[in-house]
């Protein structure tokens, strides 16, 4: 213990430790003066903690006054003991519980607020409890939400109402108190927070920072004295040297490029001197860069949607290195956009295309990055604009045409331009496709002028209107004026003549007056379109159809086409399935009216027979001399005449040895195909006759309907595989059942016999109409099979009518 100062060394197990007895140990006062070699700080604290101002004041006071003063000490909170308060909080009775940790898995603990009330808050709470009940925990939760929602800027009252789900008065009171207390508070928040280190380094010397970030310190050897500052200086020096080396390399590259440019300039001058290019013409021609063209093979687009990948083949032209070495900016001319011709100029006839050469693009107008397609040699086109100035001056704006790389564009052919339906003469199907007709709409009932019907997407019917000089006049036309001839004009095909073209149509449309236009529509020289009405099966519409049936049919009838001859029966004309269904509905309705009228007549005849039996016999004898009325004959003839395609069907009998025609009765002979018919009552007066629409089946390609007249007779008509002819003589009318007929269809004009039938029917208006009593049998027989007759129009009886 001779040395008063020593340095602590590690214990050596090989070295024996000295043993001291109690009398050899020095006293405590003697050991106080021993100082170790490792110096200790007077406070025993770290270097950062010594800078605390309370500690420095205490140390400086001790050094000045050489004694310890009570006022100059480090502030330490005093520990006080209040036994009475402690005994009130903690009772003396204590029982050890069975378990110290209680877990309630199904109950979630409510989050406790970080804010704690103070005496000032308690005063406000007592004042608020006078008007409403509010708990301390509820008040702490409100203040806590306001504090956490605010950072440097306080929340507004509207935002506070969204945060707090309380009464508006309570929210406003708490909010005003919180704002006032927050402004008076010196700290950043009312909730006490642990002080942490700031990133700007301002809290490095603050001893009250609780948590600091770990600083990465360099491990240096103490014997060489390499600290962190010297290491950072070396890194900075290395970066500066690297930057200087990079700058020198770039300067070296720049000077080398200048030298190469000087050599190339000398070579160009020598070549120009040898070529004699003193004006620079050859040099300017070489400076124009040649554009490389690429040919892209576009994969074919299949109809089934499967696009097979086709390898692209890019064919590049030979590259000239002398062209690409010097790329100079060339002033590019502005792209010219020719004005589009107006609609009036399209109507004028286009002159014949001449064999003038196409304009060639100047190569100087093309920039370096303007790529032309593979067709530029044959059909050169102007490249697309690239500058924003040109795009602004472009009349099309953002919708201007621009070339797309890899696409092939073909120039328009001058010989096919302006080939529109309005400028060319069309004939046949093309003329019907592009023609415009005078059109009438059903709902609302009005005329819209000239229009063209076409089929749009989804099956919609679209009307394309055509503007003419007479639009104001045509729209004032009464649609009822066109109803008489609209059906025939829009169904019948106009006569196709080579002299009638669209030019003549335009002449009629633009120069004719209103009466001339109407006369042209009536004579089918000008087309008129009117939509067809749908035929419904409602009872109300059936009554309207039955009332207007005669008037419509009389208007449509032009001639009756039925001929009888000695050697055969010739039937001219036919009707369509749609017209047949329309006539069938009208006939069924008229048949019902006839049946009701017949029943009324029978009741009146029975009453007259009981009162005047002799008068009934004379009336019955006069009944046989009277025949068919005019309305029934005209309606029967209209079933044949009113058809879209006029035609004639001739039915010729086989002229064999045993055939004879006695008073219009055709004798059956051999076997042949049967004529199918449909029985339907037809008359405006009760009980006159029954009209049949006969379907002739003599050839696979022929299918015609023949209107016939069947008078009811007490005798029955028996039918079998071959139709037997049954004849009923009524003065000048005979009913014939044709058998063994061969049908040939050909187009012809109405026969004289048909015109004779119309004349006879018109003269019969003066004959009084008498209802035979035997007509009920045919009507009753017709009512047994209404469904089968409505579907296919086939019946078991086949009769024809002959007027003598």
Curated annotation (Swiss-Prot):
Listed name of the protein: Enhancer of polycomb homolog 2
Q: Which GO terms describe its cellular component?
A: NuA4 histone acetyltransferase complex; nucleus
Instruction: Quote the InterPro entries the UniProt record gives.
Output: Enhancer_polycomb, Enhancer_polycomb-like_N, Enhancer_polycomb_C
Residue stretches of biased makeup (Low complexity): 602-611
Where are the compositionally biased (Polar residues) regions? 654-669
Protein family per UniProt: Belongs to the enhancer of polycomb family.
Major location (coarse): nucleus
Q: Which GO terms describe its biological process?
A: chromatin organization; DNA repair; regulation of transcription by RNA polymerase II
Role: May play a role in transcription or DNA repair.
Q: Where is this region: Disordered?
A: 372-398, 484-507, 602-623, 642-669
Q: Give the gene symbol.
A: epc2
Task: Name its cellular compartments.
Answer: Nucleus
Q: Which organism is it from?
A: Xenopus tropicalis (Western clawed frog)
Q: Which PANTHER family match?
A: ENHANCER OF POLYCOMB
* Keywords assigned: Chromatin regulator, DNA damage, DNA repair, Nucleus, Transcription, Transcription regulation
């Amino acid at each position: 213990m001779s040395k008063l100062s020593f340095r602590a060394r590690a214990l050596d197990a090989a070295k024996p430790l000295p043993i001291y007895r109690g009398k050899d140990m020095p006293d405590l006062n003697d050991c106080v003066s021993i100082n170790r070699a490792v110096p200790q700080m007077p406070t025993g604290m770290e270097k950062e903690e010594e800078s605390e101002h309370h500690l420095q004041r205490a140390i400086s006071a001790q050094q000045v006054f050489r004694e310890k003063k009570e006022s100059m000490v480090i502030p330490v909170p005093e520990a006080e003991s209040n036994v009475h308060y402690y005994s009130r909080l903690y009772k003396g009775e204590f029982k050890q519980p069975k378990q110290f940790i209680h877990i309630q898995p199904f109950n979630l603990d409510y989050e406790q607020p970080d804010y704690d009330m103070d005496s000032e808050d308690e005063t406000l709470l007592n004042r608020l409890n006078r008007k409403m009940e509010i708990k301390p925990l509820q008040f702490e939760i409100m203040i806590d939400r306001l504090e956490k929602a605010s950072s440097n800027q306080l929340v507004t009252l509207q935002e506070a109402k969204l945060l707090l789900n309380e009464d508006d008065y309570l929210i406003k009171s708490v909010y005003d108190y919180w704002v006032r207390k927050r402004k008076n508070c010196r700290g950043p928040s009312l909730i006490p927070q642990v002080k942490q280190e700031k990133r700007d380094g301002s809290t490095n010397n603050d001893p009250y920072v609780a948590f600091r970030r770990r600083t990465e310190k360099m491990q240096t050897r103490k014997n060489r004295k390499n600290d962190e500052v010297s290491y950072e200086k070396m890194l900075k020096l290395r970066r500066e040297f690297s930057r200087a080396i990079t700058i020198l390399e770039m300067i070296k590259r720049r000077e080398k490029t200048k030298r190469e440019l000087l050599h190339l300039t000398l070579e160009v001058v020598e070549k120009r001197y040898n070529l004699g290019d003193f004006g620079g013409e050859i040099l300017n021609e070489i400076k124009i860069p040649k554009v490389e063209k690429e040919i892209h093979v576009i994969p074919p687009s299949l109809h089934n949607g499967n696009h097979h990948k086709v390898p692209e083949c890019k064919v590049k032209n030979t590259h000239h290195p002398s062209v690409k070495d010097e790329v100079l900016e060339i002033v590019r001319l502005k792209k010219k956009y020719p004005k589009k011709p107006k609609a009036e100029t399209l109507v004028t006839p286009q002159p014949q295309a001449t064999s003038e050469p196409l304009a060639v693009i100047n190569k100087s107008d093309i920039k370096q990055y303007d790529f032309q397609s593979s067709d530029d040699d044959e059909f050169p086109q102007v490249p697309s604009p690239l500058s924003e100035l040109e795009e602004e001056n472009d009349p099309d704006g953002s919708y201007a045409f621009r070339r797309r790389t890899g696409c092939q564009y073909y120039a328009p052919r001058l010989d096919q331009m302006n080939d529109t339906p309005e400028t060319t003469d069309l004939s046949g199907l093309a003329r019907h496709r592009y023609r415009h007709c005078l059109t009438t709409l059903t709902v609302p009932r009005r005329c819209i002028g000239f229009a063209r019907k076409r089929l749009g997407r989804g099956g919609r019917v679209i009307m394309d209107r055509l503007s003419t000089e007479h639009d104001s006049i045509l729209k004032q036309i009464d649609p009822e004026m066109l109803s008489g001839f609209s059906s025939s004009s829009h169904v019948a095909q106009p006569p196709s003549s080579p002299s009638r073209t669209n030019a003549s149509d335009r002449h009629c449309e633009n120069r004719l007056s209103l009466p001339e236009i109407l006369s042209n529509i009536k004579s089918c020289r000008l087309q008129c379109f009117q939509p067809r009405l749908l035929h419904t099966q409602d009872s109300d519409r059936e009554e309207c159809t039955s009332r207007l049936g005669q008037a419509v049919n009389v208007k449509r009838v032009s001639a009756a086409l039925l001929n009888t001859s000695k050697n055969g029966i010739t039937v001219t004309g036919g009707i369509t399935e749609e017209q047949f269904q329309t006539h069938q509905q009208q006939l069924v309705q008229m048949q019902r009216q006839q049946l009701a009228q017949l029943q009324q007549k029978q009741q009146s005849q029975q009453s007259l027979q009981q009162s005047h039996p002799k008068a009934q016999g004379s009336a019955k004898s006069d009944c046989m001399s009277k025949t068919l009325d005019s309305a029934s004959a005209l309606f029967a003839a209209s079933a044949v005449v009113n058809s879209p395609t006029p035609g004639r069907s001739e039915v010729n009998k086989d002229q064999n040895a045993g055939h004879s025609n006695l008073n219009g009765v055709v004798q059956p002979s051999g076997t042949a195909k049967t004529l199918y018919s449909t029985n339907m009552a037809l008359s405006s007066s009760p009980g006159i006759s029954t009209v049949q629409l006969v379907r002739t089946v003599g050839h696979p390609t022929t299918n015609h309907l023949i209107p016939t007249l069947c008078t009811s007779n007490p005798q029955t008509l028996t039918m079998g595989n071959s139709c037997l002819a049954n004849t009923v003589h009524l003065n000048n009318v005979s009913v014939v059942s044709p058998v063994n007929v061969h049908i040939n269809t050909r187009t012809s004009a109405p026969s004289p016999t048909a015109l004779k039938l119309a004349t006879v029917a018109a003269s019969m208006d003066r004959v009084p109409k008498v209802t035979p009593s035997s007509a009920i049998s045919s009507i009753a027989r017709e009512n047994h099979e209404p469904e089968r007759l409505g579907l296919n129009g086939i019946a078991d009886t086949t009769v024809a009518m002959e007027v003598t």
